[in-house]
Regions:
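Structural and coupling elements of P-loop NTPases
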Residues: 1-526
């Protein structure tokens, strides 16, 4: 029977992040295909293959062809247990993605070869840098026309502020794309497009082998040798330690849609990516190999099964062994829970599990007991760090349009806020509920889900606000004076913390100048 240490060593828990339409969900599908978790991949946003993408769960995702919630999937690959967190790709869904990055040990970033580094990728990379998360980059869509691979490497370094080292290299791109030379394994993989089936590799292990010319032609063979010479002269050798410290990103090239370059990425990933890492709590650092179980809730998902109004709390196991029906303490309330039906996920399929190990994500049925950031332990009081709320970018008042469905609306808003879809503030001046999101699409998602999952109808009333700032002060009198002066702009969040709603940058700066005793924060963690 495998020991705790053995189970930890074989686990790889990571997120795939990208700008919308870079091919992230497609890459996830193909990784599942190689893991034997699915046998046919569903082409995203295409009717050519009738199966809908495995990791897109919610009805609105299926309609729009974008992922709007974080999906969790696990599968075995060789000796390894892989846990993938597929994050929302749409630019409006940063908040859920920020939180997901607190539950993973490494990240794969997908970049479109035609578009290079985009805004969302930069923002997510900042969160990775805050936590020194190891990053691998997959440059996708090589079968389409795009930019020169060396230009892409330069942009990755300058925009993401991280060193890069190619571990595979494309032979031409677009219509002339012939394949990829795998630098890490010293093999040549020739391109044969296939959207559904796993490709066999065609291997040529030595670049001086005349079969290289036979495979790709004299011109491309000469260019490949020249490029590889340039790479070894310009880029540092791959240093695994630098990668694990979050300072160096290995880069792979391929076409996820055509299942090309994906296996090379996966084979290298399982070898170099970190197994579960220590987690920082306020009290101390928790190491995965500790005997006592601990874990935290990083996401709550309502109505994963439209037939049942159920919630699932996603718990990341940080240390020890999680066991079904064992008593675990919820640190926030001091209550003890025995979880009778914990689940593991393969996209839509949920299986009841008897045990889980560090790095695993366990689904816990929730009837309203759990909140994002909750800690479960075998008794020790631990508070894990790194689940802040950030100031939303857009704000709207939510109005009930059907007074007969007030209860349903209240319940729906509460559950959606528990999921972290958006943030809710209560305006202290007029008592109205204010919803804050990272972008416009989230308002549409909330409205759609309230109607289809709770039978409640709402409308939105826009309000022009610049930022929501959490405020605090060591001087109680100064805090009261500020709240009195700014009473029209004061709100509380769901935890009852004071929030100042600044309607412009100028108003915020004036408030900071006029009230030096008040500290203003753009994140709830201070």
């Amino acid at each position: 029977m495998a020991s705790l240490t053995d189970e930890i060593k074989r686990r790889r828990t990571f997120a795939i992040i990208s700008h919308p339409d870079a091919g992230k969900t497609t890459l996830t599908e193909k990784l599942l295909l190689f893991g034997g978790a699915i046998h046919v991949a569903g082409a995203v946003k295409s009717n050519k293959i009738k199966k809908t993408a495995t990791s897109d769960w919610m009805e609105i995702e299926k309609q729009r062809g974008i992922s709007v919630a974080t999906s969790v999937m696990g599968f075995d690959y060789g000796d390894y247990k892989i846990n993938i967190l597929d994050t929302p790709g749409h630019q409006d869904f940063a908040e859920d993605t920020y939180r997901t990055l607190t539950a993973v040990d490494s990240v794969i970033i997908v970049v479109d070869v035609a578009k290079g580094v985009e805004q969302q990728t930069r923002k997510l990379m900042e969160v990775c840098r805050m936590r020194n998360t190891p990053v691998i980059i997959f440059v996708n869509k090589l079968d389409r026309e795009g930019r020169d691979p060396f230009d892409i490497l330069d942009e990755l370094e300058s925009e993401l502020k991280i060193g890069v080292r190619p571990l595979s290299w494309p032979i031409n791109i677009g219509a002339k794309f012939k394949g990829v030379y795998n630098i890490y394994e010293n093999s040549l993989d020739l391109f044969k497009p296939d959207k559904q089936k796993v490709q066999e590799r065609v291997e040529i292990t030595d670049l001086s082998d005349p079969r290289v010319e036979e495979a790709v032609g004299e011109t491309d063979a000469a260019k490949l040798r020249e490029d590889l010479e340039l790479i070894s002269g310009v880029y540092p050798d791959f240093d695994e330690e630098e990668y694990l410290r979050g300072k160096l990103a290995p880069v792979f090239f391929g076409s996820a849609l055509n299942t090309f370059g994906v296996k090379e990425l996966l084979d290298c990933f399982v070898k170099i990516a970190p197994s579960p890492r220590p987690t920082q709590a306020d009290e101390r650092e928790i190491r995965p190999e500790e005997e006592a179980f601990s874990g935290f809730v990083f996401k709550i998902h309502a109505n994963m099964d439209p037939n049942h109004r159920s919630c699932i709390a996603f718990v990341k196991v940080c240390s020890g062994k999680f066991e079904r029906n064992a008593p675990y303490k919820q640190v926030r309330t001091d209550k003890v829970f025995r979880i009778a039906a914990p689940t593991a996920f393969m996209a839509q399929r949920k299986n009841v599990v008897d045990e889980a190990y560090p790095g695993d994500i366990v689904g816990v049925p929730d009837t309203g007991n759990f909140k994002i950031g909750d800690t479960l332990t075998q008794g020790e009081s631990l508070h894990f760090r790194g689940l802040p709320s950030f100031s939303p970018e857009m704000f709207k008042y939510i109005e009930n349009t059907d007074p007969m469905k007030s209860k349903q609306l209240e319940k729906g808003i509460r559950q959606l806020m528990d999921e972290g879809v958006a943030q809710m503030f209560i305006n202290q001046f007029n008592g109205r509920k204010l919803i804050g999101t990272v972008g416009q699409l989230q308002f549409e998602v909330i409205q759609y889900r309230l109607l289809h999952e709770y039978g409640a109808q709402c409308r939105w009333e826009p309000i022009s606000l610049y930022k929501a700032c959490w405020i605090e002060s060591d001087d109680a009198a100064a805090l009261e004076a500020f709240k009195k002066r700014k009473h029209q702009f004061m709100a509380v969040d769901r935890e009852g913390r004071d929030v100042f709603l600044a309607d412009s940058n100028y108003v915020l700066q004036m408030a900071q100048n006029d009230f030096p005793a008040i500290r203003f924060h753009f994140s709830s963690e201070f």
